[in-house]
Amino acid sequence: MDSSMSTKKKTKLSVRNQTCFKKSSLSSSSTAKKTTNLSMREQTMFKKALELSTLCNIDVCVIYYGRDGKLIKTWPDDQSKVRDMAERFSRLHERERCKKRTNLSLFLRKKILDDTKLSEKVLEMEDSLESGLRVLQDKLLLLQPEKNQTEFGQTRAVSSTTNPLSPPPSLIEDHRHQQRTEPLMSGVSNTEQDLSTSSLSQNQSKFSVFLYNHDNCSFYQVPDSVSSFDSLTSTGLLGEQGSGLGSSFDLPMVFPPQMQTQTPLVPFDQFAPWNQAPSFADPMMFPYN
């Protein structure tokens, strides 16, 4: 039992020693890694300073301090140049120092503000363009009737130019007005013609036809049949004449109460019987009541 217990204790101690050794080895390896990483960063920083000084043709210095505040390394290696550049920078005004300094937080904030202002300006410009477009649309709506009238006038002018035989619009309007008024005028003329014809027939019923002999100064009355025939014939002829005059001058026809010829014809006997054929003589018409 004692031997077994002693072996167990030895194994536990050996395990503890191994774990302690592992921890120390891990810590030393992590420290070495940190050191290498730091040295690589130092080399990268000094390399960038050299490139910046060469490409931009400016004075660049790097001052590297340790954790305890001791100076570890400078670039360039000549510390007098580094001291000179540091003194010149310290003598600058705060405003001049800010020009040479870049704050990322301030830069980003300024960038955001600039973008916001730009977006606001774009919105204002868009609103102004939309308002101008509305004004132009309203003007186009107001000018549309005038444009239509102008195009209609130009079309009429072109049509009259291309067709010189076509009458002008004023003559067309006069013709249309004449067509509208012609039925009324024809109705009036027809009424006047009917009235003149009826009055003529009434007046002619009161006339008798006599033949006058210039030799013995005698009269011969034409029979009623011949008188009515001549009356109807003269009525038709004078009716046509009266209608022609009415349609031409729109005036009522006036008939003379007495008509006679001036040139004598052949003589005839006053006392001849009624059935004897009379000679041609001057016909005369006398009214009677």
Swiss-Prot record:
<dbReference type="GO" id="GO:0045944">
    <property type="term" value="P:positive regulation of transcription by RNA polymerase II"/>
</dbReference>
<dbReference type="GO" id="GO:0046983">
    <property type="term" value="F:protein dimerization activity"/>
</dbReference>
<dbReference type="GO" id="GO:0003700">
    <property type="term" value="F:DNA-binding transcription factor activity"/>
</dbReference>
<feature type="domain" description="MADS-box">
    <location>
        <begin position="18"/>
        <end position="78"/>
    </location>
</feature>
<keyword id="KW-0804">Transcription</keyword>
<protein>
    <recommendedName>
        <fullName>Agamous-like MADS-box protein AGL93</fullName>
    </recommendedName>
</protein>
<feature type="region of interest" description="Disordered">
    <location>
        <begin position="151"/>
        <end position="197"/>
    </location>
</feature>
<dbReference type="Pfam" id="PF00319">
    <property type="entry name" value="SRF-TF"/>
</dbReference>
<keyword id="KW-0238">DNA-binding</keyword>
<keyword id="KW-0539">Nucleus</keyword>
<dbReference type="InterPro" id="IPR036879">
    <property type="entry name" value="TF_MADSbox_sf"/>
</dbReference>
<dbReference type="GO" id="GO:0005634">
    <property type="term" value="C:nucleus"/>
</dbReference>
<dbReference type="GO" id="GO:0000981">
    <property type="term" value="F:DNA-binding transcription factor activity, RNA polymerase II-specific"/>
</dbReference>
<keyword id="KW-0805">Transcription regulation</keyword>
<feature type="compositionally biased region" description="Polar residues">
    <location>
        <begin position="187"/>
        <end position="197"/>
    </location>
</feature>
<comment type="function">
    <text>Probable transcription factor.</text>
</comment>
<dbReference type="InterPro" id="IPR002100">
    <property type="entry name" value="TF_MADSbox"/>
</dbReference>
<dbReference type="GO" id="GO:0000987">
    <property type="term" value="F:cis-regulatory region sequence-specific DNA binding"/>
</dbReference>
<dbReference type="InterPro" id="IPR033897">
    <property type="entry name" value="SRF-like_MADS-box"/>
</dbReference>
